[in-house]
Amino acid sequence: MLDVTLIVLCAGNSTRFEHKTKKQWIRVEDEPLWLNVTKRISSFAKFDKIIVTSHQDELNYMKNFSDDFTFVKGGETRQLSILNSLQFVTTKYVMITDVARACVPQSVIENLLNEKSSADCIVPILNVTDTVVYENDTIDRSNVKLIQTPQLSSTQVLRDALNTPIEFTDESSAIKAIDGKIKYIQGSTFSKKLTLGDELDELPCLKAPSNNFFTGTGFDIHAFEEIKDMYLGGVKLPYEYGFKAHSDGDVLIHSVIDALLGACGAGDIGEFFPDTDDKYKGIDSKLLLGQIVNFINNVGYEIVNVDLTIIAQKPKINPFKDEIKKSMAKLLRIEKQFVNVKATTAEKLGFIGRAEGVAVQSIATLKYYNWKKR
């Protein structure tokens, strides 16, 4: 083995990316970018361990994609994400890269590994080819270098270097600050960092997302409860009962949430909003759906349509179907034509037929966010 751990940093918020999906979750065919980058680099060498950092909100979901990596909750900053990851590193050396460096070539990885014992930090750099101006003065561009990742460091030296309140933008800066030895090697233009959304077309290794569709179903049922308002699809219905539930009991929204989570393979509503958590007691279900729609978009999907079946003896649903469609379209951020609402009774059979509650069955269809068309 190499005695090297690979860390791939994927916990950022993509605030400058200007796409509805976070950069680490855009699809390359059927793979999220973080998985594509991790598999690509790990194919170039036999690392002792591979660590992937994730935003806390996406950590459990990310674990669904592979059992071959160690997933670690990222920090508020790049440096904190590295510190969190270093707790799981036992090798002498560590190679750290950013998911934004999507097309790092094999030659860079091999050159880093070949030089691992020659300095405390091995750093790929590029010469500057454009004219450089600093504070209105043109400076000698031969003295300016562009620092890239991945970088390969001595694990212990890096731990010592990051044990400071000072924030560094890369490992070499931190190690240089404690007088560590830095060695520069030739970088690559293919290791360009993806920061802005319009830079996607400059990365030749990225293929467009597939045209696959993903379908999920949801089902929820709630009994009636006195002295409570009834909400269905975010619409307040004039009925004498509400729904018995930990939240406001909007059975339609709860069903849709499960359908959305099912379509992207992210579990169910109870995993995101457990009914044992007091912060969700009496909560407006529209807020819960908003969080799920944000999650769906963040991890690379767009909502195509939903088909909703409300099963109720009472109240009568037909007079409110159009209002429910409008409400759900707004909440799901899709056009009204892509929301279908059906209503049926239980023919006076069972719990629902005795007018003791309402059930809703939902089907949701998703597709990958197509960054190629933006």
Swiss-Prot record:
Q: Per UniProt, which keywords does this protein have?
A: Isoprene biosynthesis, Lyase, Metal-binding, Multifunctional enzyme, Nucleotidyltransferase, Transferase
Judging by the UniProt lineage, the source's domain of life is Bacteria
Alphabetical GO biological process terms: isopentenyl diphosphate biosynthetic process, methylerythritol 4-phosphate pathway; terpenoid biosynthetic process
Instruction: List the Pfam families.
Output: IspD, YgbB
Q: Which Gene3D superfamilies match?
A: 2-C-methyl-D-erythritol 2,4-cyclodiphosphate synthase, Spore Coat Polysaccharide Biosynthesis Protein SpsA, Chain A
Q: Where is this region: 2-C-methyl-D-erythritol 4-phosphate cytidylyltransferase?
A: 1-213
Q: Where is this region: 2-C-methyl-D-erythritol 2,4-cyclodiphosphate synthase?
A: 214-374
- Site positions for Positions MEP for the nucleophilic attack, renumbered to this chain? R141, K193
Query: What EC number(s) is this enzyme filed under?
Result: 2.7.7.60, 4.6.1.12
Decide whether keyword Transferase is in the record: yes
Where do the TM regions start and end?
A: none
Pathway(s): Isoprenoid biosynthesis; isopentenyl diphosphate biosynthesis via DXP pathway; isopentenyl diphosphate from 1-deoxy-D-xylulose 5-phosphate: step 2/6; Isoprenoid biosynthesis; isopentenyl diphosphate biosynthesis via DXP pathway; isopentenyl diphosphate from 1-deoxy-D-xylulose 5-phosphate: step 4/6
Family to which this protein belongs: In the N-terminal section; belongs to the IspD/TarI cytidylyltransferase family. IspD subfamily.
Record-linked NCBIfam families: ispF, PRK09382.1
Protein name per its UniProtKB record: Bifunctional enzyme IspD/IspF
Q: Which organism is it from?
A: Aliarcobacter butzleri (strain RM4018) (Arcobacter butzleri)
